[in-house]
């Protein structure tokens, strides 16, 4: 019963129709979002080998402050929806504002409000000291409130969470300009290192938190409705969409892989040696198990997270959905591998791996990016859209899957991070594909049915009224006299299925509707959730 109530609270509270300015309302509350303090590891301590990359990047950022790039970073420190809109207006070539493009502005504004909650709990948990405070200097962002920052945790970066969330959302809305948008979003996070407000690992963590935020948003009927409206508004400016828009090109978005001449190579080497120390532990055994990357392997891993069985017999729709996503992620990872060759750690350092039988075959394949990590993180994000009751466990497993490749000696840490970013924007590009939408809808409904979430009244019902399900009918009964109002029934994608003016006891039929999730509201409040399991 606890999982049922949590599922309802987390998955379906997105239908909020209260009379207020929706531009300022997040799509989900913080307790309905993944918690980065659970699925991500703690930030590196200053005594950790992993701090080497943070320190090197701090030095690099400091060297950039007196350059035009440093001026850009300082200007970007303003923390507002208007500044974010201005940044992406410049990138996309038209004005995004509340007056000029109200639908796109709403999407950005509400996305930002939600993204802020993606990192808040982790910030409070770790309260990491920021670079400028640790190094006894002043922050270089013109709009940064230094005193506020001193009392606000550095890990993960809030600015980066907002910037990368916005980039992912706008790239989904406008795939015609996805490379430019995503590159701009990547630079926005880099700016926080330059001004000394964040360590590199804060920024890396925030990009992952942002990707979980956008994955979570896909389950919100309000988000999908706002996305559709923003897309329509965008096409009025852009014109007819091209027939075929491919996937984002990572070569245009992320920097080239780190080579041995780069100062950042020392961070990769440090991470390699630290991970290598885990090989003779249970974590090393897990890394060997994680070498397998078939769909069936991921279904088994996610089954453990969910405490239920997922396979092609029990969950054919979920299997079909993950199989489709798996193929797309793998193809995009291969496309990047074929264009960027990097030697694997065990080849570069000559120190062997955890899986020696694969070394000869894999030695001529690029280390960058990690396909295993692309699949592990991408499929975990894909599952978030289905399983709001188990988000953190699935995301933690997806993250660990990538780290297993560092432990095994098959990938550098930076290969894994690049793979996770590739996975996120590839997955959200798929949201525009009709086949993907068909598969994810079927998978979402199948998961709800497997969990047994069927016809659950919501506790926050209007006073003096009782709600129940009788067969294919939603029945509203007033217990303290007649009430009037509007009873709406929505599909999970936000479409109004039934609209009834209520005066007294009412019964609304769901007969004839396909298998799916339906949400009833009375005068704007969610009153009933029905997972229809019969036709």
Give residue ranges: language-model regions.
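Short, surface-exposed loop/turn motifs with a glycine/proline- and acidic-biased composition
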Residues: 498-528, 533-535
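Short, glycine-anchored, charge-dense loop/turn motifs used at functional sites
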Residues: 336, 490-497, 518
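Sec-dependent N-terminal signal peptides
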Residues: 4-13
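Short beta-strand/loop motifs in extracellular/secreted proteins, especially
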Residues: 483-488, 516
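Residue-level detector of functionally pivotal "anchor" positions at catalytic/ligand-binding pockets or at interdomain
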Residues: 452-473, 480-481, 532-535
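Sec/Tat signal peptide C-region and signal peptidase I cleavage site
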Residues: 15-19
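Non-cytosolic beta-sheet module surface loops
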Residues: 478-481, 512
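Hydrophobic alpha-helical bundle signature of multipass membrane enzymes
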Residues: 20-194, 216-222, 226, 232-408, ...
């Amino acid at each position: 019963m606890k999982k049922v109530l949590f599922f309802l609270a987390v998955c379906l509270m997105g239908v909020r129709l209260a009379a207020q300015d929706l531009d300022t309302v997040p799509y989900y509350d913080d307790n309905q979002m993944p918690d980065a303090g659970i699925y991500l590891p703690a930030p590196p301590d200053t005594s950790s080998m992993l701090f080497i990359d943070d320190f090197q990047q701090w030095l690099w950022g400091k060297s950039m402050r007196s350059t035009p790039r440093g001026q850009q970073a300082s200007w970007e420190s303003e923390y507002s929806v208007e500044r974010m809109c201005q940044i992406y207006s410049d990138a996309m070539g038209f004005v995004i504002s509340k007056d000029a493009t109200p639908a796109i502005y709403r999407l950005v504004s509400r996305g930002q409000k939600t993204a802020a909650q993606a990192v808040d709990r982790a910030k409070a948990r770790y309260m990491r000291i920021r670079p400028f405070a640790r190094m006894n200097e002043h922050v270089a962002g013109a709009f940064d409130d230094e005193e506020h920052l001193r009392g606000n945790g550095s890990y993960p970066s809030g600015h980066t969470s907002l910037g990368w969330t916005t980039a992912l959302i706008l790239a989904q809305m406008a795939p015609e300009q996805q490379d430019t948008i995503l590159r701009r979003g990547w630079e926005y996070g880099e700016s926080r290192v330059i001004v000394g407000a964040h360590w590199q690992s804060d920024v890396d963590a925030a990009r992952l938190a942002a990707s979980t935020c956008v994955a979570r948003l896909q389950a919100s009927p309000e988000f999908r409705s706002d996305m559709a409206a923003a897309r329509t508004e965008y096409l009025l400016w852009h014109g007819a969409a091209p027939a075929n828009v491919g996937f984002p090109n990572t070569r245009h978005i992320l920097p080239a892989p780190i080579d041995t001449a780069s100062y950042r190579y020392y961070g990769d080497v440090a991470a390699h040696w630290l991970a290598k120390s885990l090989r003779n532990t249970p974590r090393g055994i897990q890394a060997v198990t994680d070498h397998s990357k078939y769909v069936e392997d991921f279904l088994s891993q996610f089954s453990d997270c969910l405490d239920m069985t997922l396979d092609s017999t029990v969950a054919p729709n979920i299997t079909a959905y993950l199989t489709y996503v798996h193929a797309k992620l793998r193809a995009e990872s291969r496309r990047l591998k074929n264009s960027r060759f990097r030697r694997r750690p065990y080849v570069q350092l000559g120190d062997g791996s955890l899986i020696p039988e694969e070394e000869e075959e894999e030695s001529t394949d690029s280390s960058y990016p990690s396909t295993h990590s692309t699949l592990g993180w991408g499929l975990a994000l894909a599952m978030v859209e289905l399983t709001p009751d188990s988000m953190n466990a699935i995301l933690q497993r997806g993250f660990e899957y990538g780290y297993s490749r560092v432990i095994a000696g098959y990938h550098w840490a930076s290969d894994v991070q690049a793979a996770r970013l590739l996975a996120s924007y590839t997955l959200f590009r798929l949201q525009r594909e009709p086949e993907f939408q068909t598969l994810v809808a079927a998978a979402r409904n199948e998961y709800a049915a497997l969990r047994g979430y069927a016809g659950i009244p919501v506790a926050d019902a209007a006073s003096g009224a009782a709600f129940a399900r009788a067969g294919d009918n939603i029945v509203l009964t007033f217990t303290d006299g007649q009430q009037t109002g509007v009873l709406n029934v929505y599909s999970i994608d936000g479409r109004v299925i039934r609209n009834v003016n209520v005066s007294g006891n009412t019964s609304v039929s769901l007969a004839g509707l396909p298998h799916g999730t339906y949400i009833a509201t009375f005068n704007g409040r969610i009153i009933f959730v029905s997972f229809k399991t019969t036709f």
